[in-house]
Amino acid sequence: MAIIFLVTFIGLMGFGIILPLFPFYAERMGASPEIITLTMAAFSLGQFVAAPLWGRLSDSIGRKPVLILTLLGSSLSYVILAYAPNLTVVILSRILSGLMAGNISIAFAYVTDITDDSNRAAGLGKVSAALGLGFMTGPAIGGLLAGNSVENANYLLTAWAAAGINFVAMVAAIVFLKESLDA
């Protein structure tokens, strides 16, 4: 259970790292306020479309491989964001990031697999806490990494930090996470 907490926490922390700077980054790329809003919503659209598909796939091939794939894809989406040459690539990176955000629903499915009626609520509560803690710490870390000026913010470092954190979560899942459908 501790590893799924850690993987969930790290995944949400990686997502949150870029949030405080993203509107400024998109604006620097020439986005209007409306496009910035749509670009941020692109993540949610990708997540909305992909989460049920990831869930179905994890039911058939297992939670662990799908979790690893989504964490790898999330990491890749932040690398693409780091080197996006234009606004179109920024938007595509956010859609890819959303498509790869299936790890949240998979974490809940994993906990449901490994718990019973006596400890399921506690297990799901721990995953929810990991989500909240990751989402709280990510923006704080992103703000610290960016520096003290929006004009001179280090967007590359924050995107790479998000990629790196998701990669660490993926490695942790590979090394420490047991497949729950075999449990």
Task: Give the predicted meaning of each segment.
Residues 1-24:
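Pair of pore-lining "gating" transmembrane helices in MFS-fold secondary transporters
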Residues 43, 71-78, 165-169:
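MFS 12-TM fold signature
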Residues 48-87:
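Conserved MFS/SLC helix-loop-helix module at the cytosolic interface between two early adjacent transmembrane helices
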Residues 9, 77, 88-102:
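Hydrophobic core of transmembrane alpha-helices in multi-pass small-molecule transporters
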Residues 93-131:
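Cytoplasmic helix-loop-helix junction between adjacent transmembrane helices
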Residues 127-175:
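Helix-loop-helix hairpin linking two adjacent transmembrane segments in secondary transporters
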Residues 16, 44-52, 102, 135-136:
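Residue-level signature of mid-helix packing/kink "hotspots" within the transmembrane helices
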Residues 174-183:
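Flexible cytoplasmic inter-helical loops of multi-pass small-molecule transporters
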